[in-house]
Amino acid sequence: MSRRLLIILGPTAVGKTDFSVSKALEYGSPVISCDSRQIFRNMSIGTAVPSASQLAAVRHYFIQSVPVTQAYTAGDYELEAVALVERLFDEGHETLVMAGGSMFYIDAVCNGLDNLPDGDSALRAELWERLGKEGVGTLAEELRLKDPLTYSQIDTRNSQRVIRALEVCLVSGRPFSSFKTGERRKRSFEIEKIGLTRPREELYSRINQRVLNMIDEGLVEEVRSLLPYRDCQALQTVGYKEIFEYLDNKIPLEEAVRLIQRNTRHYAKKQLTWWRRDPDIRWIDL
C-alpha cells in the first residue's frame, strides 16, 4: 500500500486553502495544516484560518490547537505532525494532504530537525520578557557573543529565531550552530510537494485586498482582545505587531494597514525565494 504525503505549499494569499480542500476531498484525506500562525488560538482573523464552510467540508488538524500563551517550535511540530501522519497511514489512508506556508515547519517534516537539547520554559519566558523590555537588538548581540556563526546566518530581526538560538546556547552551554548536522531524516512515507504560484502583481493585489478584508472582519478588535498577551511568541508576527502600534497611538490605522500589506508582501517574496531553491517542488500556476 502506498503511503504518500502530498504537501501543498506556496506564498501567503496564493490560494492554498481552497486547493488543499479540493485535494483532500479527492483523496478522502483530512487537511494537516502546516502553518506556524494558524496553529494558535484566538488569532483567526489575522492569520486567515480556513472558513467555517472549509472546516466543515474536511477535517483539519493543527488549526487553533495551541494556546496563544504557549511557546511552540518547529521541533514540537515535527514530533506531533509526523506522529499524526504515521497514525493516519496506519489507519488506511494512502494519500494525506498537508498544506501551509511555514518554511521551517515544512522542512521539519520533510528533512527533520537537528537533535537540539530540551528547552527550558522558564528561561524562554524570561527571554520573551526581556524582549519586551530591551528589544531584539540586545538579545541578538548576546547571541553574537555566544554564537557568531548562527548570528551571521539568521535574520536577527526575527525575535523568535533569536530567542530559540539563545535559549539553546544558555541551556546547553554550547553554540546553537554546534548542533547542526545537516543530515536528512528518513521517513516511512513518500513526500510529494506541489507549489502554488500566481503572477506577482496578482498575488500582491490579493494580499492587499486580504488585509482590507481582515480590517472589515474585525482585526482591530481581535488584536485589542490580545493586548494582555502581546509579548507572547505567537503575537510577534505581521498583522498583530502593526495593530499594537496603532492601539498604542503610535501610528494611524491607515499606516498600520499599509505596513501590514507591505510586510506581508515582503514575507511572500521571502517564501518564494526559499522554495525556488528546492528542485523537488512541482509548481502550478493558478
Predicted regions mapped to residue ranges:
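Phosphate/pyrophosphate-binding catalytic cores of soluble transferases and nucleic-acid-acting enzymes
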Residues: 1-286
